[in-house]
């Protein structure tokens, strides 16, 4: 049930009946304060201005024509023409019943789209580091959310698996295998990469061999392809361990690296030339874009092929967008890439649109994000200024969570403690990021993220166990609750109304790619449940009808918290 959508439709109908143009916006919003009702329609002022009519007069006309019988208890006009809508308690109670009994908490079924989500994108022969964290967990939350709504999701892990560095990596892998009879496991990819680079810089014969391998690899040489595949496989096997630890849904089957588009690049350059979009300039092939100007105010040149015949990231990104539309049949493509890549992506997509590779009906969206900073406000690094490996960050989170939980639960068995620390530590890292607006930089702070108070994963996980434990404690099965829901106390009504706003929240998250909106909703919901729990006795209610009604409200709260956290990729536990 999407109350906002329902009320928007009703207010729009009343506006049209009152003489407003058919496309007039109702601007229905959740009210910030209870005295202004549960929802507010703010669109009257703008429409009245268009009609040359006093806003209050139009508001009165709209209220008379509003068909909200059985939905709203009353409507009031406030100020110059705001319409405050107070929902009917019985109607809200009946909608809560529906949400409890329907699949997916009563969400309105969507028209399924094929949505490609580009996220994570680590590099081959390098270990994942904290810089990969935001794309990985924000992108995964988007994938889970849209999948839950009923869309067909294609996860695309745009791995950096191509480039001139592979000549040096293949040459070094060959050297290592010749020197060691054991099969390489590349347990420390960073050290492997550093050693390969050192040999390349210091050994002329090695460098010559490496350059030769680049040419052979690009020409499809079978030996080089085999060595290259080995490097990709070793890297992605190691990355998969990180994904599984993070409770991220990416698998090896989702790898769609840069190399996937290699065969398309010559044809794209030829086609852009044929269409008059690309021209030769100083030996390179360039697309000049009027939409972007250089310092002299002239159209900016975007190189798609270098003098030496090599291609650039832009060329690959053009091919990638074309492939996602033509081959994957995408209706919508979301890119979870940091904000520094914005202009690069916009230029690639401008070329894509001009060339007719992807129609305007297919949405290409850059869901950019800011940086992860340390407490000093600088990019998050080790004390020595080095990059923090993702696996080391996860190890530290686990160690901290284990210590914290052991202090709070000295009697807990060690295996139970370990399982709980795993769930809490991963939840804490993910929620700390997801609860901040993705477009801003955020400060990584261990103490805040592992706190059991405030808008944190441990607090949210505890809030869920608190609700779930009511049923456990009393030995109640949900199918034994048959009495209807009644909302006589204002706290019952506030909780019920907020529960029904789950669909509005998840719809907004799906549209904008903003998981922090879900985090805020869940935190607010947990707070409302806390107030309800303290002031409205559940198991000790005055009679069985009230007891069952409150238990059913608690049940929907538990289901909503669990489902909401699941869309973020955060697990819940039954005991904390």
Curated annotation (Swiss-Prot):
Pfam families: Arg_tRNA_synt_N, DALR_1, tRNA-synt_1d. GO terms for cellular component: cytoplasm. Keywords: Aminoacyl-tRNA synthetase, ATP-binding, Cytoplasm, Ligase, Nucleotide-binding, Protein biosynthesis. One of its GO terms (molecular function) is arginine-tRNA ligase activity. The keyword Nucleotidyltransferase does not apply. One of its GO terms (biological process) is arginyl-tRNA aminoacylation. Gene3D superfamilies: Arginyl tRNA synthetase N-terminal domain, HUPs, Isoleucyl-tRNA Synthetase, Domain 1. It is found in: Cytoplasm. Its EC number is 6.1.1.19. Signal peptide: none annotated. It is an enzyme of class 6 (ligase). The keyword Nucleotide-binding applies. InterPro entries: aa-tRNA-synth_I_CS, Arg-tRNA-ligase, Arg-tRNA-synth_N, Arg-tRNA-synth_N_sf, ArgRS_core, DALR_anticod-bd, Rossmann-like_a/b/a_fold, tRNAsynth_Ia_anticodon-bd. A motif ('HIGH' region) lies at residues 122-132. It catalyses: tRNA(Arg) + L-arginine + ATP = L-arginyl-tRNA(Arg) + AMP + diphosphate. Monomer. Belongs to the class-I aminoacyl-tRNA synthetase family. This is Arginine--tRNA ligase.
């Amino acid at each position: 049930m999407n109350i906002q959508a329902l009320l928007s439709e009703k207010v729009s109908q009343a506006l049209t009946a009152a003489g407003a143009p058919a496309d007039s916006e109702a601007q229905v919003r959740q009210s910030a304060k209870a005295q202004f009702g549960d929802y507010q329609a703010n669109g009257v002022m703008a429409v009245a201005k268009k009609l040359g009519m006093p806003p209050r007069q139009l508001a009165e006309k709209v209220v008379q024509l509003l068909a909200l019988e059985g939905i709203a208890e009353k409507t009031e006009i406030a100020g110059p023409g705001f319409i405050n809508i107070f929902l009917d308690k019985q109607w809200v109670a009946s909608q809560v019943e529906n949400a409890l009994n329907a699949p997916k908490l009563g969400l309105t079924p969507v028209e399924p789209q094929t949505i490609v989500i580009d996220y994570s994108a680590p590099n081959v022969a390098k270990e994942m580091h904290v810089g990969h964290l935001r794309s990985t967990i924000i992108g995964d939350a988007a994938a889970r959310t849209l999948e839950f709504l009923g869309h067909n999701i294609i996860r695309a892990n745009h791995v950096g698996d191509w480039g001139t560095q592979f000549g040096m990596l293949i040459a070094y892998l060959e050297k290592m295998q010749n020197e060691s009879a054991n099969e390489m496991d590349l347990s420390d990819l960073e050290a492997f990469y550093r050693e390969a680079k050192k040999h390349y810089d210091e050994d002329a014969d090695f460098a010559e061999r490496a350059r030769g391998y680049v040419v052979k690899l690009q020409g499809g040489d079978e030996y080089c392809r085999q060595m290259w595949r080995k490097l990709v496989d070793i890297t992605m096997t190691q990355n998969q361990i990180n994904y599984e630890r993070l409770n991220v849904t990416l698998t090896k089957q989702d790898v769609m690296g840069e190399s996937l588009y290699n065969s398309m690049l010559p044809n794209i350059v030829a086609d852009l030339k044929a269409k008059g979009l690309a021209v030769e300039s100083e030996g390179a092939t360039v697309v000049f874009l009027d939409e972007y100007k250089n310092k002299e105010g002239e159209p900016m040149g975007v190189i798609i092929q270098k003098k030496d015949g090599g291609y650039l990231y832009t060329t690959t990104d053009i091919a990638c967008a074309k492939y996602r539309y033509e081959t994957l049949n995408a209706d919508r493509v979301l890119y979870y890439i940091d904000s520094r890549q914005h202009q690069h992506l916009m230029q690639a997509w401008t070329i894509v649109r001009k060339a007719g590779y992807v129609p305007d009906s297919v949405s290409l969206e850059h869901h950019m994000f800011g940086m992860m900073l340390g407490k000093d406000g600088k990019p998050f690094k080790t004390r020595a200024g080095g990059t923090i490996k993702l696996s080391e960050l996860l190890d530290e989170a686990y160690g901290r969570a284990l210590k914290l939980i052991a202090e709070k639960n000295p009697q807990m068995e060690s295996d139970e403690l370990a399982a709980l620390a795993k769930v809490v530590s991963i939840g804490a890292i993910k929620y700390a990021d997801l609860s901040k607006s993705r477009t801003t930089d955020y400060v990584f702070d261990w103490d805040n993220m592992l706190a059991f108070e405030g808008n944190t994963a441990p607090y949210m996980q505890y809030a869920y166990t608190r609700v779930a434990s009511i049923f456990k404690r009393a030995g109640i099965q949900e199918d034994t609750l048959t009495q209807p829901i009644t909302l006589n106390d204002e706290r019952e009504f506030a909780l019920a109304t907020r529960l029904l706003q789950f669909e509005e929240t998840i719809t907004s998250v799906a549209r904008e790619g903003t998981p922090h909106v879900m985090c805020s909703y869940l935190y607010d919901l947990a707070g409302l449940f806390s107030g309800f729990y303290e002031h409205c006795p559940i198991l000790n209610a005055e009679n069985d009808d009230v007891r069952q009604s409150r238990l059913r409200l608690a049940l929907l709260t538990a289901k909503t918290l669990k489902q909401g956290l699941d869309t973020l990729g955060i697990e819940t536990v039954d005991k904390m």
